[in-house]
Swiss-Prot record:
Additional observations: In the reaction, the free carboxyl group of octanoic acid is attached via an amide linkage to the epsilon-amino group of a specific lysine residue of lipoyl domains of lipoate-dependent enzymes.
Residue numbers marked as site, Lowers pKa of active site Cys: K137
Residues making up the signal peptide according to the UniProt record: none
Localization terms from the record: Cytoplasm
Gene designation: lipB
GO terms under cellular component: cytoplasm
GO BP annotations listed: protein modification process
Catalytic activity of the protein: octanoyl-[ACP] + L-lysyl-[protein] = N(6)-octanoyl-L-lysyl-[protein] + holo-[ACP] + H(+)
Family, per entry: Belongs to the LipB family.
Presence of keyword Oxidoreductase: no
Species of the source: Wolbachia pipientis wMel
Key words of the record: Acyltransferase, Cytoplasm, Transferase
Protein name in the entry: Octanoyltransferase
Length: 205
């Protein structure tokens, strides 16, 4: 069984990581159900295990070092953070590449419900859209596994302040931009998006 939790207040990043680490231990011990946690953070940058100082352009917000994969990214209001704590071993899916592909299919299917064509790129993790002839990232992935239980997850840009990205080179990728559902002409309340996320989740997972 997969539990769903929606936090309406902004969640401190370190508190979120601590909560995830406690939860995945419980899942591994079979003392808790899997969890999909939907939330938002206050404005901040996170630095994954591949992050380098060269990707910091201007320190507009606090930077948190984190154990997830990837480089620097931004989190803030208007972005739907999706933290997934899933037991891949119990699901007989002990394959990180397959997990990333499943996450990608899920978010692509969600975007399709809003007439947004999201695409997966083998060499650039995340979900991409073509906006006025330019490839831009609309969803960033950063995952970690412990004993085949996943944590961290996805940041989907719904209506964030995109100017907040100017302090970093997102995911260390030069020459690519970021976009949001709002910039693509789709204005959707988070509550409506959450319903679609849940519905489409069970088609993949």
């Amino acid at each position: 069984m997969t539990e769903w939790l929606i936090s309406n207040q902004l969640i401190d990043y370190n508190c979120a990581v601590k909560s995830m680490e406690e939860k995945i231990q419980q899942i591994h011990n079979n003392s808790a159900d899997e969890l999909v946690w939907l939330l938002q953070h206050p404005p901040l940058y996170t630095a994954g295990i591949s992050a380098t100082a060269d990707d910091i352009v201007e320190k507009l917000f606090p930077i948190y070092k984190t154990g997830r994969g990837g480089k620097h990214t931004y989190h803030g209001p208007g972005q739907r953070i999706i933290y997934l704590m899933l037991n891949l071993k119990k699901r007989n899916k002990c394959d990180i590449k397959l997990y990333i592909r499943d996450l990608s299919k899920w978010i692509i299917n969600v975007l399709k419900q809003f007439n947004i064509l999201g695409e997966f790129r083998e060499d650039r993790i995340g979900i991409w859209v073509n906006h006025n002839g330019v490839e831009k990232k609309i969803a960033a992935f950063g995952i970690r596994l412990r004993k085949w239980v996943t944590y961290h997850g996805i940041a989907l840009n719904v209506f964030p302040d995109l100017s907040h990205y100017k302090g970093i080179i997102p995911c260390g990728l030069q020459g690519y931009g970021v976009t949001s559902m709002e910039e693509l002409g789709v204005k959707v309340p988070l509550s409506e998006l959450d319903d679609i996320l849940k519905k489409e989740f069970y088609k993949i997972f």
